[in-house]
Amino acid sequence: MTLEERVEALEKELQEMKDIEAIKELKGKYFRCLDGKMWDELETTLSPNIVTSYSNGKLVFHSPKEVTDYLKSSMPKEEISMHMGHTPEITIDSETTATGRWYLEDRLIFTDGKYKDVGINGGAFYTDKYEKIDGQWYILETGYVRIYEEHFMRDPKIHITMNMHK
């Protein structure tokens, strides 16, 4: 392999590593905005061509606005949520496309309303596709398949002492 070929291979490898890191940051922003209920900012993580498949394909949406409108209506301020994406497996498929798999662990606590004191714990596998537009990565397709989900009544003696949404 010539020096030029080695440099070219290293540049390609470096770009792939940068792309993987950018995708990790993108998914991190998605989860942060989801739990922070920052719907406008969450929308900036989504491709204009987004397709979702949440809850084993029961919830399918085809635009950033559809996604955030649904999330806004289904995640009221009375709900504390914590979505954690772990162990990413990201493959750069081309200069402008990538695929990712994430392990999701999520916890929800309802502090008011119809579901007051209900808790939900769950786990799922996310599968995403990403596209790069004008040098920026976006979520093109996202969805998860549940491993498990449990609902339970929280002990009334346990009190939430801090809630960023109140």
Swiss-Prot record:
- In Swiss-Prot or TrEMBL terms, this protein is called Bile acid 7alpha-dehydratase
Is-annotated flag, keyword Zinc?
A: no
GO terms (BP aspect)? bile acid biosynthetic process; bile acid catabolic process; lipid catabolic process
According to the record's subunit comment, the protein's assembly and interactions are:
Homodimer.
Write out the pathway annotation from the protein's UniProt entry: Lipid metabolism; bile acid biosynthesis
Q: What does this protein do?
A: Functions in the bile acid 7alpha-dehydroxylation pathway, which forms secondary bile acids via the 7alpha-dehydroxylation of primary bile acids, and is carried out by intestinal anaerobic bacteria. Catalyzes the dehydration step in this pathway, yielding a 3-oxo-Delta(4,6)-bile acid-CoA intermediate.
Q: What induces it?
A: Induced by bile acids such as cholate.
The record's gene field reads baiE
Q: What is the lineage of its organism?
A: Bacteria, Bacillati, Bacillota, Clostridia, Lachnospirales
Name the Gene3D superfamilies on file. Answer: 3.10.450.50
